């Protein structure tokens, strides 16, 4: 019995062909009997397409019926006039004639976005001359044909200094397919530091898109990226060591070879400064800290201390000063120690003892747990950050929860919450609790200070 062909359009899976001057379309006829089937093609305006551009393939017998394909290769300018352009596939068969529109998904013309990534100072390496790379990326463009080139001071660079990747399709969302390419230019450290101008050019659809860059663009104060932050001593540091540690934090360093951090007193006298430098961060910058210590009495007197940062990337030294804040409200904390809940003890697993520290100002406070007069490992307790009191935002509270075994608590072991704050008469208070008393007991604070206090000279 006879069977009419079913027609299906064939288009390229790639919305932008390697040779964008040519367009290939096809037509599939399947499930027909008997053979043969004859193909012909017409433009949208019904004029015939020359047989020189048509390639017909032999029928294939499969599943008891035949299928055949026809392909047409045309200059893109012949049909790419608008987004709704198409050509028509015609077939003749003993069962009659059929036709099928074959539409081309027209590749949109999108210009490239050109960006240049400059090398960080510490990226230059190798023997003399030390070299690094400028990286130019053209992205978001379509169609895919693009030509990348570099200029130095307006003149083309040597081709051997340039490496350009293959054009790649970008991850496709709901929009059209776009492309990306990366071009790298090898430069010497001297070329970069001499403030020469480099230009990356992208030639796309007859238009040139470019970006210029030089080290002079990076040389002003706001572009060095170097920032200085002063960290005052914590009460815990002052309480435990009877000295105040001053910290000068420097961020955004491209290199640290020329870095100098120094602390000085109000009268200009230099303080011994210890500098620690971090490992390189993911953005290829470094962080440094400059530490100096002064006596507790000197810090509490309100004396001003100054940190000075010098670096080859800075046009002039950066200076910032730090002193103990004046006219700060001093309110000593109230301390409450709460025994574990009975519901928790019934589980016979662990016991949570809570130390509630309330109504204090300023917010810097020190909380430590002790057992048999010795500090408990901090991994066994957690202390919250100071939080404003809901009914009095000028005052703060924290809570610290110590977790011990149910066995230790039930055996009558005593645990102490030690709280340090500058508004307390002796800077510290201690309250203990155990199963027997079931309520906190105030201890002599001198016992706590005897092992931790030190003398500042």
Curated annotation (Swiss-Prot):
Pfam families to which the protein is assigned, alphabetical: C1-set
Region called CH2, residue ranges: 106-220
Keyword Disulfide bond: yes
Region span, CH4: 327-457
Disulfide bonds, paired cysteine numbers: 27-89, 136-200, 248-307, 355-417
Annotated organism of origin: Suncus murinus (Asian house shrew)
SMART domains per the UniProt record, alphabetical: IGc1 (SM00407)
SUPFAM superfamilies per the UniProt record, alphabetical: Immunoglobulin (SSF48726)
Glycosylation sites per record: 45, 113, 212, 276, 283, 444
Gene3D superfamilies per record: Immunoglobulins
Keywords from the named record: Disulfide bond, Glycoprotein, Immunoglobulin domain
Entry protein name: Ig mu chain C region
Region feature (CH3): 221-326
Region of interest (CH1), ranges: 1-105
